[in-house]
Amino acid sequence: MSIILLDPRTINRIAAGEVIECPASVVKELVENSIDAKATAISITIERGGRNLIIVSDNGIGIKKEDMEIAFARHATSKLPDGDLTKVRSLGFRGEGLTSIAAVGKVKMVSKYRDSDTAWLMVFEGGEKTQELTPDALSCGTYIEVRDLFFATPNRLKFLRTEKAEVQSIIDMMNKLAMVNHNVMFSLFVDNKQVFKYLTQQSNIDRLSEIKTLGMEFCKNSLPVNVKEEQIQLSGYIGSPTLSRGKSSLIYTFVNSRPVYDNLLIGAVRYAYSDFIEKDKYPVVVLYLDIPCDQVDANVHPNKSEVRFQDKKLVYRTVVNAIKEVLSINLNTKLKSISEFENDHFVHASMVNSRNIGNSVSSEFFKCFQNRKPLLNNDVQKYSSKNVETDDQSLLDTNVSFCTDSKMITNKLKEERVYENSREHINKGDSKIEVSNFDILGEKKNFVNLANNLLQESPSIDSGKFNTSKKVPSDSLIDTYPLGYALCQIHSRYIISQTQDSIVIIDQHAAHERLTYEYMKQVMAKEGIKRQILLIPEIIEMNNHLDLELLVEYKEKLLKLGLLIEPLGNLSVIVREVPALFGSFDVKSLIINIVDSIMEVGDTLFLDDKIKDICGTIACYSSIRSGRKLKIEEMNAILRNMENTAHSGQCNHGRPTYVELNLVEIDRLFSRR
């Protein structure tokens, strides 16, 4: 058969197959055009999931009469006047949207240009113009009506999902566009019922509070992000680890005001949260990246939902560092667990509150202790809290930051009194932590001793201050410590402590698990990761010279992480030493995954993740268990270590380690207020 040129109608229908995949694609193209037209109010109407009818109307600048017909021509656009793809700031630029919609549906468009006195009507069916340009009535902007979608390509109808599923796709897509355009009012009607109406807002967080999938729960449990790294501006909001979900659909990323789903960004977000949530969980995040147009390529796919970054490593590092920094500061927010508690039938929502206790201990409090040695170090007295100095670029970052809580310490005099009281207890103590035989990096079996080492740091029992025979501790002691003084243990699982104006309920296993994990990170960051020499070095054949060059380039960093490799010639490398923590594992698979990680994000993150996973598992199994009875001294040892430990608000799986109930709120429970 001879080769022939396809007719324009067939060409447009083929092209429409990529651009218009479903009704949500139609809505996306039309709404993006409205946003590019500077509309401040956009209305969408849907019938039967978009199969029968889609209407999008706006109050934008409209289309000139002379441009009405050419707007439906293939690759016709007003958004690339000089044809420079490195300067694309608009959502649309390919000139395929209207052409593709008209090729598969029946389209009626009415538009009035802002300086014109008359609106004009244009009608297309199956890619053919069926009515000449005629005057029509419209106050402003553009009105587009699409009926009988895919009537010209009936095979596509077979692959559409149920009406409810298609409507949900439209809602999800509209939510994304609304998140990044808070100054635009959006309304959606489905089968004559209004689904939502988002009013014009002053800020992104106000808009996020309107969106049902996020709502006030996210706003109350999120932390703001705002950093600039070289030419990248990153802003947005990151959810508390306790808001984690089982899928990544609530990780919203926007690049230059364009909603995108990018594996690099998703991976960066997950890595930043890896110390706080389970491996199979995803955080709730909304991030806005503003990057120079010449450093990002949006012309990857016709639906424009994918991008390519010129400097992937810079983007990845910016996202990871920004999220980690905010999580380390860990501002006071409301815990998801408390939100669930409020929904209980006997508790009014306003009666219970909590701090996200990740590090809700005042930074001012810990300034008093910055000259002391780190917890659990050899020959260190009880309650010392100087941070281990580490390389802040290390992926095993142990930088400890604390937020300032005015409720904790109200003035400088109180800080000094707290310091003097704490120093008095420390100086009077005569017991030291015995961990000289605890080789955290040598043999994994020794990790099981960490629980006992932690609990052996019991406070000095002098002057009756920590005397378990006293039923009620002194007010000065309660006032001294932000997490209070332990009173009892219930069900051999939870510690109850009393502060000056609240009670604190601590999950002993979750809290101790975080203490163990953070200690392991400190030791590894300070002393390095102990390596194990392979009895028989393993030779790995690389696929190509690029893979080999990448491994050689990152050789020194891999050595710091416990992996000693050397080039052997041709395409081979020899692995002589591996991290001792790993035990028995597939060396070749590890090397391949490391290379993939380097190629994807320019870093050895796969190896870092594997080390973190092993440390997390060891921390979980070596920590005190639920059901173990503790002495008052042991309970207080846990509390003091929590106050001095980063990220102690959540265990390694993202669960809260404690909740705090204010006395005022408890009084309300009993109708005392």
Curated annotation (Swiss-Prot):
<dbReference type="InterPro" id="IPR042120">
    <property type="entry name" value="MutL_C_dimsub"/>
</dbReference>
<dbReference type="Pfam" id="PF08676">
    <property type="entry name" value="MutL_C"/>
</dbReference>
<dbReference type="InterPro" id="IPR036890">
    <property type="entry name" value="HATPase_C_sf"/>
</dbReference>
<protein>
    <recommendedName>
        <fullName>DNA mismatch repair protein MutL</fullName>
    </recommendedName>
</protein>
<dbReference type="Pfam" id="PF01119">
    <property type="entry name" value="DNA_mis_repair"/>
</dbReference>
<dbReference type="GO" id="GO:0005524">
    <property type="term" value="F:ATP binding"/>
</dbReference>
<dbReference type="InterPro" id="IPR020667">
    <property type="entry name" value="DNA_mismatch_repair_MutL"/>
</dbReference>
<comment type="similarity">
    <text>Belongs to the DNA mismatch repair MutL/HexB family.</text>
</comment>
<dbReference type="GO" id="GO:0030983">
    <property type="term" value="F:mismatched DNA binding"/>
</dbReference>
<keyword id="KW-0234">DNA repair</keyword>
<dbReference type="InterPro" id="IPR038973">
    <property type="entry name" value="MutL/Mlh/Pms-like"/>
</dbReference>
<dbReference type="InterPro" id="IPR013507">
    <property type="entry name" value="DNA_mismatch_S5_2-like"/>
</dbReference>
<dbReference type="GO" id="GO:0140664">
    <property type="term" value="F:ATP-dependent DNA damage sensor activity"/>
</dbReference>
<dbReference type="InterPro" id="IPR014721">
    <property type="entry name" value="Ribsml_uS5_D2-typ_fold_subgr"/>
</dbReference>
<dbReference type="Pfam" id="PF13589">
    <property type="entry name" value="HATPase_c_3"/>
</dbReference>
<comment type="function">
    <text>This protein is involved in the repair of mismatches in DNA. It is required for dam-dependent methyl-directed DNA mismatch repair. May act as a 'molecular matchmaker', a protein that promotes the formation of a stable complex between two or more DNA-binding proteins in an ATP-dependent manner without itself being part of a final effector complex.</text>
</comment>
<dbReference type="InterPro" id="IPR014790">
    <property type="entry name" value="MutL_C"/>
</dbReference>
<dbReference type="GO" id="GO:0006298">
    <property type="term" value="P:mismatch repair"/>
</dbReference>
<dbReference type="InterPro" id="IPR002099">
    <property type="entry name" value="MutL/Mlh/PMS"/>
</dbReference>
<dbReference type="GO" id="GO:0032300">
    <property type="term" value="C:mismatch repair complex"/>
</dbReference>
<dbReference type="InterPro" id="IPR042121">
    <property type="entry name" value="MutL_C_regsub"/>
</dbReference>
<dbReference type="InterPro" id="IPR020568">
    <property type="entry name" value="Ribosomal_Su5_D2-typ_SF"/>
</dbReference>
<dbReference type="InterPro" id="IPR014762">
    <property type="entry name" value="DNA_mismatch_repair_CS"/>
</dbReference>
<dbReference type="GO" id="GO:0016887">
    <property type="term" value="F:ATP hydrolysis activity"/>
</dbReference>
<keyword id="KW-0227">DNA damage</keyword>
<dbReference type="InterPro" id="IPR037198">
    <property type="entry name" value="MutL_C_sf"/>
</dbReference>
